[in-house]
Amino acid sequence: MLNRTHSQGDFNRVGAFVRAGAALLVLAATCAAQSAAGGQPVSKTSSGSGAAATYADAKAAAPAAAAPKVGEAAPDFKLPYATAEKLFMKPDEQMSLASLKGKNVILAFYPADWSGGCTTEVCTFRDTFMEFGKLNAMVLGISGDYVFSHQEWAKHHKLPFPLLSDHDHRVAKAYDSYMEQYGFNKRTVYLIDKEGVVRYVNLAFKAGDKKDYDSLRAELEKLK
C-alpha cells in the first residue's frame, strides 16, 4: 500500500521544482530568440526581462487567429484554476466565462508564471484589485502553466484573483493570444462586460507601462 500522506517539506520541494521548471522554460525561449537573431542578445524591455522581449518580438511572427473584436461575444471557455488557497481541478469546479455573467471580467493572458514581466503584471493587478472590484470587475490571469505552479506563484505574491490553466492553449488560440513557435501566450488583455461582450482589446499589453493600465481602467469606468 502506498503512503499517500505528504509533509510540508514535500510540498515545498514540489514548489521549488515548479519554479525551477518555469525558469528553465523562460530561459529556453530567450535562447531560441537569440538563435533566430543570429546569436545577437535579446534586448531587455522596461520590465527588465530579456524573456519578455522575446515574447514581444515574436508577436508579429505568431500565427494569428481571428481575435474577438470590440462589440463581439467573447468565446466561452471552461478551465481548471488555482487561487493562493486552493486548487479547482474537477470538472464541476472549473471556471467558465458563462458563469461570470453579471460581472465585468478582465481577462489577462500572460506567458509564464515566475517570469519577470509576468510578475510585474500580476502584482500591478494585485495592487489595483480593490479599485477594479469597486467597478464590479474581476481579474482572471491565464497561461499554459499547471495549476500547481499557479498556486505556488499566487501564494508567493499574495494574489487575490484566480489563475486559470490553459495547458493546451486552446483558449489562448481562440483569443489570438498564443505564440506557436515558442509555446507561450502573448501578453494580451481583454475587457468583457456583464453580458459577455468584448469591450476592450489590447493585443500588445505592456506589463510595465502605466498607460496600458490607465486605458483599461478608463474603459472599465464606462461600464459602471
Residue ranges with predicted function:
Residues 162-166:
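Short acidic-hydrophobic, aromatic-tinged amphipathic segments that line or gate anion-handling sites
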Residues 159-161, 178-190:
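Structural micro-motif
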Residues 106-107, 139:
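Hydrophobic beta-strand anchors of alpha/beta hydrolase catalytic cores
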Residues 78-105:
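A short beta-strand-turn-helix
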Residues 75, 104-106, 186-188:
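Short loop/turn microsegments at loop-to-beta-strand junctions
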Residues 113-159, 169-173:
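Structural microenvironment flanking redox-active thiols in thiol-disulfide oxidoreductases
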Residues 2-88:
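N-terminal targeting signals for export/organelle localization
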